Amino acid sequence: MTSTKDKIEKLRKILLKYEYFYHTLNQSIISDAEYDYLFRQLYELELKNKELIPSDSPTQKVGSHILQKFKKIKHFSPMLSLENTFDVNGYLNFKKRIKKSIHNNEPLSFCCELKLDGVAISIIYEEGIFVRAATRGDGFEGENITSNARMIDSIPLKLKGIDIPKRLEIRGEVFMLKSNFIKLNKKYKLNQNKYFSNPRNAAAGSLRHIDPNITAERKLIFSCHGCDFFVKTNKELTTHYQRLMKCLSWGIPVNKEIVICSSDIEIIQFYKKIAQKRNFLDFDIDGIVIKVNSLELQKKIGSTTKSPRWAIAFKFSPKERITTLNDVKFQVGRTGVITPVAYFNPVYISGVMISKASLHNKNEIERLNLHFNDTITICRSGDVIPRLLNVIEIRRCDNAKKIIFPSFCPVCNTELLENIEEKLIRCHSGLTCDAQKKQALYHFFSKKSLYVVGLGPKIINELVEKGLVKNPIDFFYLKDIDLIQLKNVGKRKSIKIINSIKKCKKTTLKCFIYALGIPGVGEVVAGKIANYFIKLDKLMNSNILELNCISGVGKIISNNIFNYFSTISNREMVVKLIKQAGIFLNDQEIHKINSEKTYFFNKKIVLTGVFKSFSRIELKTILLSLGAKISNNISRKTDFLIYGNNFGSKFFRAKDLDVKIINQEELNSLIRIKE
């Protein structure tokens, strides 16, 4: 007589076999009704014999508990992104770099696959059993989505076959079929009056849903595109293609559109073939991925901190749609730059609704020869940024009105001035223009300037509209009674903002210069100016020749700085901020050190992580004052990497390049500043 244990084991094996054929081989060998019947039998038997339920049972993909939150999980090796190209020349340059890096003329073979538009995840198997899954996250640390990934039918909970490594990492994409996406949106909109913008967003939201049962309902699909065995298997695999086929034999889904190419013609033909099939597929792709097939060569070629050097994504040209231009509005930026924005009938491109696109400047309007109600072609550059490509002039009405760039500011009616060199048109009325005033004030109190907690754009806009503030000085005379009359600002929040305004008075010369919002003067340039002049009065009284002497500050920015401090109203405002509002530039301690060469003088430095003794902005200011050059990217020219807690990929890149690494304790000692 067959025991209950034997019945359960037999049912599991049958169901796992059917799942393998259906999800991996795309073959349905039994009807849905038959499958459901067997599944129900197993479920009821396990319900009565819970001690007999293993983690790889088909029933464990339903009925999981609801997660409260996703914990962070570190990847065994970084999950890198891919370099992109949109044309043949980009691919040829990629191949040329590879040839150069391997120093030989041996024929190369490439493994070409579909670039699925999904969510990248990592899955770990131990002894062939699914143990964990994580999203890419920042490449080094992702979200632990183990419970939700278990709900995806195409992810096997137990591998089958031989030569399965003790530990195996599978990487691939989770995506949603277009047909399922349409059904989900109909249901979602009906119940919640909301919808997902595209299948990828739907897949990402479903994968991270707090309830794994919802993930199960969404019918997500997984496809493997790579793996890591950690240790050598009994049968050594030498190519990427062999690894994928091995994964397939273990029951891991791999997309069937894979080819090995040995010539440029073969790769381009595959690209064209997939481009033609793209719209007929039931899932989104945005190109093909070209990988060096040899694992030995992959290792030799290596990776950057962002992407493997041995692979590239050959993306499809941006999709285009035809629509009608309704209007062009001219927006006024913080520095007075006038930017035309085209508004048109909404169109869907790559699953996203688009109704406007920046026209950048006057030259673009003239190039397009835009008229109202023109028929226009819209695309998404890189499948991301909306762009107006061209006008179909043959469809233009005879009486169509041409769009003319204004001669006066659309907000304050001041005459606009054109800078031929910068190809920009500006309103020079500064803070007397409401549009510039609002954005300039928000910039003045933003994080890298004189940061005030809780003082966001909405509050600033309302303060300006009510006439409570006209310039930065007015903020230092605000009282909590002024703030309470604003929307969504109570007594507690108003006191918090007032206290933060008082605290922001103590700042650095660099932050103060940056806060002024001089055109072209960003955080780095502000630091260089502060480091050069040391004192605010020296900067205010400088001439063009002095400004041109500052390394990294070009003629255009020098002129902008000179013009700013040559304007009487600007000088008066700066003086009032210091003398009346009481802004204190706390750089004295740094100035003493600045006069002599230090350990960091003229050294290229990169920062990573969180520091105990300083904020990132404070540390940058100190290092700049010591003559250092701050960079965001690690290279062979970098002299030092300074790291704090929770450091990122730059740390590992620095190790690879033998860059000197300095920790927080060493840093405090070297800069000779008390904590």
Curated annotation (Swiss-Prot):
GO terms for biological process: DNA repair; DNA replication. Its cofactor is Mg(2+); Mn(2+). The active site is at residue 115. Zn(2+) binds at residues 409, 412, 427, 433. Keywords: DNA damage, DNA repair, DNA replication, Ligase, Magnesium, Manganese, Metal-binding, NAD, Zinc. Its EC number is 6.5.1.2. One of its GO terms (cellular component) is cytosol. InterPro entries: BRCT_dom (IPR001357), BRCT_dom_sf (IPR036420), DisA/LigA_HHH (IPR041663), DNA_ligase (IPR001679), DNA_ligase_AS (IPR018239), DNA_ligase_CS (IPR033136), DNAligase_adenylation (IPR013839), DNAligase_N (IPR013840). The keyword Magnesium applies. Residues 595-675 form the BRCT domain. Gene3D superfamilies: 5' to 3' exonuclease, C-terminal subdomain, 6.20.10.30, BRCT domain, DNA ligase/mRNA capping enzyme, Helix hairpin bin, Nucleic acid-binding proteins. DNA ligase that catalyzes the formation of phosphodiester linkages between 5'-phosphoryl and 3'-hydroxyl groups in double-stranded DNA using NAD as a coenzyme and as the energy source for the reaction. It is essential for DNA replication and repair of damaged DNA. Belongs to the NAD-dependent DNA ligase family. LigA subfamily. HAMAP family: DNA_ligase_A (MF_01588). This is DNA ligase. The gene is ligA.
